[in-house]
């Protein structure tokens, strides 16, 4: 029982820099639904930013937080610097949700990997038990209790998650 409580509360222990190096303390997300997405500017899935923003505008006041984590591990599709990424997202998709510092969502050849993503993947392994993030715009959802309750691949669009998000916000 104690390990279960530790596991569910662990999401709130993370402190991660945003694109401007401001530290975001995940403790502020207690009692909120969090959608965590690894993003890239030059990916075929990049238009998903628009749907993410629509969800953010519609549900932020009810407790939805969306965090975009730029990642350059898939086909070098995020070559921009952090501030350029934010500017591109705002200009092209009207993004107002937080964009974080570039992140290693999977372990690289030097052994570097985001502790947050290591945690998310351990809580919700991917398809057929594959733990690694397969591509840009893979999504993790954390409920109001801090539990990682779902993981969706890149083919699932943000708007396809709307009903699930509404359900979690109602809990």
Swiss-Prot record:
GO biological process: cellular response to oxidative stress; lipid oxidation; peroxisome organization; positive regulation of transcription by RNA polymerase II
Enzyme Commission number: 1.11.1.24
Reactions catalysed: a hydroperoxide + [thioredoxin]-dithiol = an alcohol + [thioredoxin]-disulfide + H2O
Record-annotated active site: 43 (cysteine sulfenic acid (-soh) intermediate)
A Pfam family hit: GSHPx
Disulfide bonds, paired cysteine numbers: 43-89
Disruption of the gene: reported phenotype: Sensitive to hydrogen peroxide. Unable to filament and thus, escape from murine macrophages after phagocytosis. Also displays defective virulence in the Galleria mellonella infection model.
Keywords, sorted A to Z: Antioxidant, Disulfide bond, Oxidoreductase, Peroxidase, Redox-active center
Cellular component annotations (GO), alphabetically ordered: cytoplasm; peroxisomal matrix
GO molecular function, one term: glutathione peroxidase activity
InterPro entries (UniProt xref): Glutathione_peroxidase (IPR000889), GPX_AS (IPR029759), GPX_CS (IPR029760), Thioredoxin-like_sf (IPR036249)
PROSITE patterns: GLUTATHIONE_PEROXID_1 (PS00460), GLUTATHIONE_PEROXID_2 (PS00763), GLUTATHIONE_PEROXID_3 (PS51355)
Subunit structure: Interacts with CAP1 and probably YBP1.
Note: The active site is a conserved redox-active cysteine residue, the peroxidatic cysteine (C(P)), which makes the nucleophilic attack on the peroxide substrate. The peroxide oxidizes the C(P)-SH to cysteine sulfenic acid (C(P)-SOH), which then reacts with another cysteine residue, the resolving cysteine (C(R)), to form a disulfide bridge. The disulfide is subsequently reduced by an appropriate electron donor to complete the catalytic cycle. In this atypical 2-Cys peroxiredoxin, C(R) is present in the same subunit to form an intramolecular disulfide.
Protein task: Involved in oxidative stress response and redox homeostasis. Functions as a sensor and transducer of hydroperoxide stress. In response to hydroperoxide stress it oxidizes (activates) the transcription activator CAP1, which is involved in transcription activation of genes of the oxidative stress response pathway. May also play a direct role in hydroperoxide scavenging. The enzyme is not required for the glutaredoxin-mediated antioxidant function. In the presence of peroxides, GPX3 is directly oxidized at Cys-43 to form a cysteine sulfenic acid (-SOH).
PANTHER family: GLUTATHIONE PEROXIDASE
Family affiliation: Belongs to the glutathione peroxidase family.
Protein name: Glutathione peroxidase-like peroxiredoxin GPX3
Species of the source: Candida albicans (strain SC5314 / ATCC MYA-2876) (Yeast)
Organism phylogeny: Eukaryota, Fungi, Dikarya, Ascomycota, Saccharomycotina
